[in-house]
Amino acid sequence: MNMDGAFWRAIVLTIPVTLASCTDNRNDTKCSDFYTSRLDAHGFDHLEGGITRHKSSGLTFTRCAVGQRLINFKCAGSAVKLNWDDAQSYVREIAEKSGERWRVPTRIEMLEIFEGECINPAVNPYVFPNMEVANFWTSSQRMSPDAFRCSVYSYQGSVYCRQSRKVEQPFLMVRD
């Protein structure tokens, strides 16, 4: 048997397995099709002022990205997009001026709002209406190098901790 032929045959047989392992194995159902009722908040209690409490964690999240407002069950306006350092400062300033303990959520806290059964974005659209499909900042830092921070991709709720901290992205706020 020719070794070159065996080598290339092994490569060709390995490629489909490798490519299949890179896919998202969840159901490709859009969350807007998966959730059919505004009445069932699916683990969240809606509060006044465009915020919602996650029942199992007790965390309170803004329902819209910073810069948007909840009007008639939809997020209106444009999300503020800042680099990581400016996003942290922006939320600290809101906390100081409002007297509320708002902060940018950690990557673990952000994962609390994402759903495993659906995508595009992977959130309940009745809890987080018309959320932009984008990377959202978290407050989580990468060990090294210092140039990177963690974000969560809203399309499928995946964490990415090699995001340049200089990239401007939307973000939510959370409080305990």
Where are these regions (language model features)?
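Glycine-aromatic-enriched surface loops/turns that form tight recognition elements
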Residues: 4, 19-103, 107-176
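Bacterial N-terminal signal peptides
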Residues: 10-18
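Bacterial N-terminal signal peptides that target proteins for export
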Residues: 1-11
